[in-house]
Design a protein with these regions (language model features):
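Nucleotide-sugar donor-binding and catalytic loop/hinge architecture
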Residues: 1-5, 176-195
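Conserved nucleotide-sugar phosphate-binding/catalytic loop shared by glycosyltransferases and other
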Residues: 4-14, 31-80, 85, 166-168
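Short amphipathic alpha-helix
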Residues: 17-28
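Glycine-rich phosphate-binding loop signature in dinucleotide/nucleotide-binding domains
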Residues: 32, 90-96, 186-190
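An aromatic- and histidine-rich active-site surface loop
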Residues: 45-49, 97-118
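Glycine-rich, highly charged phosphate/nucleotide-binding loops
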Residues: 76-93, 177-181
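Short N-terminal targeting/anchoring amphipathic segment
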Residues: 88-107, 123-125
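Active-site-proximal region of nucleotide-activated glycan assembly enzymes
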Residues: 116-180, 188-190
């Protein structure tokens, strides 16, 4: 992998999208310290705070999800989607990424759609056993779809699927907490199996 790779990571809305995205960025930086990474998220969503706190630059799109209860409100949603696609096109043109990664959430839709239209390879990362709407819509143009669970060919083209598991932040893997420490901290019985629900 070249050290001067330029990568856009797009998506968010919830921690289920943001933290895997940060894990991907961290893994790329670990292998390619000179990599330039730009996040693209949704304005006024949690990624706009979490991503800069992790040390990465992020640009927000005015995109929002569809309102399934109040259909007339979707006129504004469609307008924001068109504005987001135009803004995503400008971001991509200015940043010139080598690849665009989508982690789900409605912010990844305009970004990856425009990247694909501009001939930039796109990769999707699906964290769930039931694929999200945005990733399903982007699957056809994606070069690769990384999934955490088997059986995802019911949502995605089988030839594009790579079973990778979910990205995990390095700091979680490097913990010094032992099983015995955890049992003591939570006051659990070490002789019993524990299931977290």
């Amino acid at each position: 992998m070249s050290n001067n790779i330029r990568l856009i990571v797009s998506g968010g809305g919830t921690g289920g999208h943001i933290f895997p995205a940060l894990s991907i960025a961290g893994a790329v930086k670990a292998k390619c310290p000179e990599a330039e990474i730009l996040f693209v998220g949704a304005e006024n969503r949690m990624e706009m705070q979490r991503v800069p706190a992790a040390g990465y630059r992020i640009i927000g799109l005015p995109v929002s999800g569809f309102d399934r209860k109040h259909l007339l409100k979707n006129i504004a949603v469609l307008w924001r989607l068109m504005k987001s696609r135009r803004k995503a096109r400008r971001i991509i043109r200015d940043f010139r990424p080598d690849v665009a990664v989508g982690v789900g959430g409605y912010a990844s839709g305009p970004t990856l759609k425009e990247a694909g239209a501009m001939g930039i390879p796109t990769l999707l990362q699906e964290q769930n056993s039931y694929a999200g709407v945005t990733n399903k819509l982007l699957a056809k143009q994606a070069a690769c779809i990384c999934v955490a669970y088997e059986g995802m060919e019911r949502f995605f083209p089988k030839d594009k699927i790579k079973l990778t598991g979910n990205p995990v932040r390095q700091n979680l893997l490097e913990t010094s907490i032992t099983h015995d420490d955890a049992v003591r901290t939570f006051g659990l019985d070490p002789a019993k199996k524990t299931v977290l629900i």
